[in-house]
């Protein structure tokens, strides 16, 4: 038997927030005039996102007087510090992750006390003692479980977690490895009105996903993996810890850079994955244009992105958790048979 993803559990905080409501909050927070308001509305309508989730209720409030996290004034001053945002992460992340873990374990009919390894993935918050320890306490995971934390690797970090899980199971076939991604992206809203923040504020939502990896004859078998760095995009995407939350650099050129980079890698993909025979793709839903550019670079039909587009539509970009949301939909889809190439 091979190592397989036997179940994936998902969770989102609160009720879905319509993209139009978030746009209204952004207009208020950025103090936009009529023309800039129309530009922002256009961007949000064309995002491919209908709903997002957040641990912060403020994004669906109509008046600043109703805010509970941000200051109750139009300038949002004083703007919440990184410390204040991490306090929310510490309070909310474990509960959200717990829901995803319980869903994954229930699907697989596996008890928490039988887990041997726990891998926590997040790029939107850090605390010690960590979220993984709180999960152990809440779920009854043994104190002897081997713990790993993958922090600050961004949207592709779940791939790193799954690769680690596969290697652990191959090293010890009795292993039961739980990979947990929890991302509270909306904690890091930035009010400065620039291109980076405009794009980031329009895309990201909160969510958690848990994948159980073990030897099994059922599930998504992990067959192979590949990691390549596209140095051309080094200055177009970055994630740094600032004084007022984590700060993102997110260039509008990323989709075209991905298109160019993937075309260069096509021969390598053929050699590594027998690419021309692959019929199903799980592409990280980083944004509508990213999905389109990857689709065009590979010469794929629009239908291959249907699950990724639905995750984007209903949840936005949840960083590392997003690809697990896509794989969960594919795991439940009986029409998908054969190999899946996942990309992030």
Q: Where would I find each of the regions flagged by the language model?
A:
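Condensing-enzyme catalytic core mediating Claisen C-C bond formation in acyl metabolism
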Residues: 1-88, 176, 185, 189-260, ...
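Short beta-strand segments
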Residues: 7-9, 121, 151, 176-183, ...
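Hydrophobic alpha-helical hairpins/lids featuring a short glycine-rich hinge
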Residues: 77-119, 123-125
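Acidic-glycine-rich active-site phosphate/pyrophosphate-binding loop
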Residues: 126-141, 179-190, 235-239, 291-305
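Claisen-condensing/thiolase-fold acyl-transfer catalytic domains that form or cleave C-C bonds
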Residues: 98, 123-124, 142-144, 149-170, ...
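Short coil/turn connectors at secondary-structure junctions
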Residues: 1-2, 112-116, 143-146, 171-177, ...
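Phosphate/pyrophosphate-binding loops at sites that engage ATP/ADP/AMP, CoA/4′-phosphopantetheine
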Residues: 100-115, 263-279, 298, 330-334
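Glycine/charged-rich beta-loop-alpha catalytic/anionic-binding loops adjacent to active sites
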Residues: 80-81, 113-117, 139-151, 191-196, ...
């Amino acid at each position: 038997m091979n190592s397989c993803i036997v179940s994936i559990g998902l969770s989102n905080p609160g009720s879905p927030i319509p993209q139009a409501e978030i746009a209204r909050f952004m207009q208020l927070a950025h103090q936009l005039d009529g023309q800039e308001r129309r530009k922002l509305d256009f961007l949000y309508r064309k995002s491919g996102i209908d709903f997002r989730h957040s641990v912060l209720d403020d994004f669906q409030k109509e008046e600043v007087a109703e805010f509970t996290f941000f200051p109750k004034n139009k300038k949002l001053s004083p703007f919440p510090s990184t410390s204040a945002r991490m306090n929310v992460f510490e309070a909310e992340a474990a509960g959200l992750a717990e829901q995803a873990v319980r869903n994954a374990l229930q699907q697989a009919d596996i008890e928490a006390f039988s887990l041997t390894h726990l891998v926590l993935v997040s790029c939107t918050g850090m605390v010690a003692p960590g979220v993984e320890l709180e999960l152990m306490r809440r779920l009854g995971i043994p104190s002897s479980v081997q713990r790993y934390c993958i922090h600050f690797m961004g949207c592709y970090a779940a791939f790193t977690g799954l690769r680690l899980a596969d290697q652990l199971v191959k090293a010890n076939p009795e292993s039961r490895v739980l990979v947990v991604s929890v991302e509270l992206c909306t904690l890091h809203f930035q009010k400065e009105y620039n291109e980076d923040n405009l794009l980031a504020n329009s895309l990201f939502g909160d969510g958690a996903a848990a994948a159980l990896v073990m030897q099994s004859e059922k599930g998504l078998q992990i067959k192979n993996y590949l990691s390549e760095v596209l140095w051309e995009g080094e200055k177009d995407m970055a994630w740094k810890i600032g004084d007022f939350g984590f700060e993102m650099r997110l260039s509008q050129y990323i989709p075209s850079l991905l298109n160019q980079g993937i075309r260069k890698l096509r021969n390598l993909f053929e050699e590594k994955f027998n690419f021309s025979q692959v019929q199903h793709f799980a592409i990280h839903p980083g944004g509508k244009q990213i999905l389109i550019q990857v689709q065009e670079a590979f010469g794929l039909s629009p239908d291959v992105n249907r699950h990724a587009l639905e995750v984007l539509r209903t949840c936005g970009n949840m960083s590392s958790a997003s690809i697990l949301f896509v794989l969960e939909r594919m795991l439940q889809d009986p029409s998908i048979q054969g190999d899946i190439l996942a990309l992030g």
